[in-house]
């Protein structure tokens, strides 16, 4: 099987002024090299603070480690830079669910669905989340959601 890492690493070193770190970090993440991916993203996000993809990949590094607050912060930063990214809002919804905040998770899924209205998967997830939040509200666990 062809290994992409050497080619990506070479390109990354050859063009240090380009934000190629996110692509290389994503590759490392897929290959299980979590700490290398995280270090690369942290450095890259510092060098390229207006590159949203770097923050989205960094959030995945944190999610893998169940570092939910750090993942939320990285996603928030990425979404401030790219506010029309439905995948970012979908992932932020997942992070909020993991943090136990169903209401904010629902708001993020609603935003993702508004940005990608043709996604059947998002529509299904949104309906499931809405049902879960309503059930929690009936038990007094969260603030009710207005319909």
Predicted segments with their positions:
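Structural marker of alpha-solenoid helical repeat scaffolds
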Residues: 47, 64, 81-82, 98, ...
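Canonical positions in the second alpha-helix
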Residues: 10-11, 43-44, 77-78, 111-112
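Short coil turns that delineate tetratricopeptide repeat
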Residues: 15-16, 49, 83, 117
């Amino acid at each position: 099987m062809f290994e992409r890492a050497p080619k990506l690493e070479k390109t990354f070193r050859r063009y240090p002024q380009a934000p190629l770190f996110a692509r290389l970090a994503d590759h490392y993440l897929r290959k299980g090299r979590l700490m290398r991916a995280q270090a690369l993203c942290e450095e890259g996000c510092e060098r390229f603070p207006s590159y949203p993809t770097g923050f989205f990949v960094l959030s995945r590094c944190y999610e893998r480690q169940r570092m939910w607050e750090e993942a939320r912060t990285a996603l928030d930063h990425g979404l401030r830079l790219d506010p029309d990214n439905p995948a970012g809002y979908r992932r932020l919804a997942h992070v909020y669910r993991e943090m136990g905040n169903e209401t904010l998770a629902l708001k993020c899924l609603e935003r993702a669905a508004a940005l990608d209205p043709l996604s059947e998967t998002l529509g299904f997830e949104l309906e499931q989340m809405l049902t879960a939040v309503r059930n929690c509200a009936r038990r007094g666990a969260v603030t009710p959601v207005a319909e």
